[in-house]
Amino acid sequence: MPHAVLDTARNFLRSFITPRRILVAVSGGSDSMGLLVALHSAIAADERRGFSLAACTVDHALRPQSACEAEDVAAFCAALGIAHRICRWEGAKPSTGIQAAARNKRYELLAEAADALGADCIAIGHTRDDQQETVAMRIARGKGDGAGDGQGEGHGGAGMAASMLYGRRIWVLRPFLGLARAEIRSFLQARGVSWIDDPSNANPAFERVRVRARIATSGGMPTPLGNGRQRAASSARAAALIEKRIRVHEALVAEVSARHAGEIDDPDWRRALLTVASVLGGREHMPAFATVQRLSQFLRSGEPGRMTAGRVVFDRRASGLYLYREARNLPVLAVGPGRQGAWDGRFTVKSRGPAVTVAADASGRLWTKRLIDAGLPAGIAKRGSTVAPEIASTDGAGLAFGEAPAQVEYHIGLYDTFLPGFDRIMADAVAVSFGRDRYPAPPVHDVLIEMET
């Protein structure tokens, strides 16, 4: 008899543009075990040529039993003939924010395992239950803190994307977002497959556990259908506006015409403008709700002047609106020989040999000239230039931005670590504006990427 879990796995494999080697993240819990078993069965039964599986268990070393549980998963994979790797989170753990830190480390270790096992992408067993919890948490956080586009307008309601690019290099796919956990457990029970229940999933000290309990006692909550597609459509519209209305000069100054500067009440334009501002400011998140409210009032007024929001100066003049990083709290970064580092959340500096020091270019003469030549007012060019990085070798010799012995590339904090699939079009528009290549395309068809609910 057909089963929804197996059908979902088959449809997931059919969504690939070409067959791939898939790394399945397997904790030993029901969701990930169900994903592993379903994909293994689908590949075997349908004779999906060219597909293969590998698996990885991340041992966070937060519980005494975790090492044995990881070995149990390894034995299960061995019985199925699936290559498996255990990656352990070594070192000290933070005393606060442990779940967020564990999540970041988990993706880092999974990406390393994918490289080691020759996998092209990673599959994770997040379910509809996880999606409901995520939506509930993001909506709660969005009330008053500007989650999403800076107005609390429900980007959190889109939940987790069915695809996510990690670290600009490997796609993480979530094929089970439309399935309930109960369906997956029924599928496993029918096949006599057991799973591990992590006691931390019942610990009310964690926000997700508390949200899960509230959802259960309230009889469940609907996951808004189509929000991922709505988010993708909004991203596409915002991307078009970035391309048409915003000129980014030398990755230092963004220019907007006077005509469009005050149209902040258009949600797609607001999102486009705030996205570019966040990138210029080296931020990983959009501005907070209260900040956006003040900024919107300033832009609506049409009056010339300057306002700072999210480390970015919004400089409004008769000729247009100009955005640039404020000249405050600019760091000094030491980069060792052959190493790389992130400066000010905006630039990645890779040493090609000797150690270098990165600091703000106090004089900014080179960049002032370039920005003036690009048509910017002299005052704007000067202000934008003083926040450019200057690289000095250990012997103190100054080096021009991007010249040997260091390579400099713009860092896009909003997207370079985690890029949801439904934001890829906008992320590409931002990358091109800042002189970067587009992000890698996903291995599955776009029409299926966004089926996250």
Curated annotation (Swiss-Prot):
GO MF annotations in UniProt: ATP binding; tRNA(Ile)-lysidine synthase activity
One annotated Gene Ontology cellular component of this protein: cytoplasm
InterPro entries: Rossmann-like_a/b/a_fold, TilS/TtcA_N, tRNA_Ile_lys_synt, tRNA_Ile_lys_synt_N
Gene3D superfamilies per the UniProt record, alphabetical: HUPs
Entry EC no(s): 6.3.4.19
Residue pairs linked by disulfide bridges in the UniProt entry: none
Biological process terms in GO annotation: tRNA modification
Taxonomy, superkingdom: Bacteria
Record CDD domains: TilS_N (cd01992)
Record has tRNA processing as a keyword: yes
Localization: Cytoplasm
Binding-site residues for ATP, renumbered to this chain: 27-32
Catalytic reactions of this protein: cytidine(34) in tRNA(Ile2) + L-lysine + ATP = lysidine(34) in tRNA(Ile2) + AMP + diphosphate + H(+)
Pfam annotation, one family: ATP_bind_3
Primary location class: cytoplasm
Keywords: ATP-binding, Cytoplasm, Ligase, Nucleotide-binding, tRNA processing
Notes on the domains: The N-terminal region contains the highly conserved SGGXDS motif, predicted to be a P-loop motif involved in ATP binding.
Function text: Ligates lysine onto the cytidine present at position 34 of the AUA codon-specific tRNA(Ile) that contains the anticodon CAU, in an ATP-dependent manner. Cytidine is converted to lysidine, thus changing the amino acid specificity of the tRNA from methionine to isoleucine.
Family: Belongs to the tRNA(Ile)-lysidine synthase family.
Full protein name: tRNA(Ile)-lysidine synthase
Species name: Rhizobium meliloti (strain 1021)
Phylogenetic placement of the source organism: Bacteria, Pseudomonadati, Pseudomonadota, Alphaproteobacteria, Hyphomicrobiales
